UniProtKB/Swiss-Prot annotation:
<comment type="similarity">
    <text>Belongs to the influenza A viruses NS1 family.</text>
</comment>
<feature type="region of interest" description="CPSF4-binding">
    <location>
        <begin position="180"/>
        <end position="215"/>
    </location>
</feature>
<comment type="subunit">
    <text>Homodimer. Interacts with host TRIM25 (via coiled coil); this interaction specifically inhibits TRIM25 multimerization and TRIM25-mediated RIGI CARD ubiquitination. Interacts with human EIF2AK2/PKR, CPSF4, IVNS1ABP and PABPN1.</text>
</comment>
<dbReference type="GO" id="GO:0042025">
    <property type="term" value="C:host cell nucleus"/>
</dbReference>
<keyword id="KW-1113">Inhibition of host RLR pathway by virus</keyword>
<keyword id="KW-1114">Inhibition of host interferon signaling pathway by virus</keyword>
<feature type="region of interest" description="Disordered">
    <location>
        <begin position="205"/>
        <end position="230"/>
    </location>
</feature>
<dbReference type="InterPro" id="IPR000256">
    <property type="entry name" value="NS1A"/>
</dbReference>
<protein>
    <recommendedName>
        <fullName>Non-structural protein 1</fullName>
    </recommendedName>
</protein>
<keyword id="KW-0945">Host-virus interaction</keyword>
<dbReference type="GO" id="GO:0003723">
    <property type="term" value="F:RNA binding"/>
</dbReference>
<keyword id="KW-0832">Ubl conjugation</keyword>
<dbReference type="GO" id="GO:0039524">
    <property type="term" value="P:symbiont-mediated suppression of host mRNA processing"/>
</dbReference>
<dbReference type="GO" id="GO:0030430">
    <property type="term" value="C:host cell cytoplasm"/>
</dbReference>
<keyword id="KW-1035">Host cytoplasm</keyword>
<keyword id="KW-1103">Inhibition of host pre-mRNA processing by virus</keyword>
<dbReference type="GO" id="GO:0039540">
    <property type="term" value="P:symbiont-mediated suppression of host cytoplasmic pattern recognition receptor signaling pathway via inhibition of RIG-I activity"/>
</dbReference>
Length: 230
């Protein structure tokens, strides 16, 4: 096993522990708590994949961080902060909408890279809006936290989420996954729209329905792909 992979996991475990202690003091805001919850799942998946105990890794990560801090000067820290590009966290959904459990009458699921696409194929003739919580950098989508499809009544009928065991995805991965979700939902004559926030940072152009252009043949091809691969 690569030593960098192990040490990276150890540092991530310790930093999560620090953030958890911070949250336990009721000092974290909604985006902070959301990332904390999702990173916990990610660490669990990585730990299982690597065969490493999280508690042991956390202690080792603490030693690594302490050693770095001992060698770090205040001036070097200022330079690092100044040179690092800043990302922003954008939210379409409330914490309740993100954490709400939902159920599917006719479940369909597809894994696309490091993203999992789920939808209820029993939903028909509905007006559906896609909402997402995500971070951006340089005015482009950086990391998808969670995307969900909502009916006008507020029911959740679809979802795109990162796989905890496979971290890392690009904005193109997200756009492709959204295309698959839209194609699957529209197969049952649903009308799908993308939220203005997601539209702005995921695509540079849109049609009058506030959603990315998607040819009919492409929609049908992606919908068939879901049915054939599940």
């Amino acid at each position: 096993m690569d030593s960098n992979t192990v040490s990276s996991f150890q540092v991530d475990c310790f930093l999560w522990h620090v953030r958890k202690r911070f949250a336990d003091q009721e000092m974290g805001d909604a985006p902070f708590l959301d990332r904390l919850r999702r990173d916990q799942k990610s660490l669990g998946g990585r730990g299982s994949t690597l065969g490493l105990d999280i508690e042991t890794a956390t202690r080792a990560g603490k030693q690594i961080v302490e050693r770095i801090l001992e060698e770090e000067s205040d001036e070097a820290l200022k330079m690092t902060i100044a040179s690092a590009p800043a990302s922003r966290y954008l939210t379409d959904m409330t914490l309740e909408e993100m954490s709400r459990d939902w159920f599917m009458l006719m479940p369909k699921q597809k894994v696309a890279g490091s993203l999992c696409i789920r939808m209820d194929q029993a939903i028909m003739d509905k007006n559906i809006t896609l909402k997402a919580n995500f971070s951006i950098i340089f005015d482009r989508l950086e990391t998808l936290i969670l995307l969900r499809a909502f009916t006008e009544e507020g029911a959740i009928v679809g979802e795109i989420s990162p796989l905890p065991s496979l971290p890392g995805h690009t904005d193109e991965d997200v756009k492709n996954a959204i295309g698959v979700l839209i194609g699957g939902l529209e197969w049952n004559d649903n009308t799908v729209r993308v939220s203005e926030t997601l539209q702005r940072f995921a695509w540079r152009s849109s049609n009058e329905d506030r959603r990315p252009p998607l040819p009919t043949k492409q929609k049908r091809k992606m919908a068939r792909t879901i049915e054939s691969e599940v």
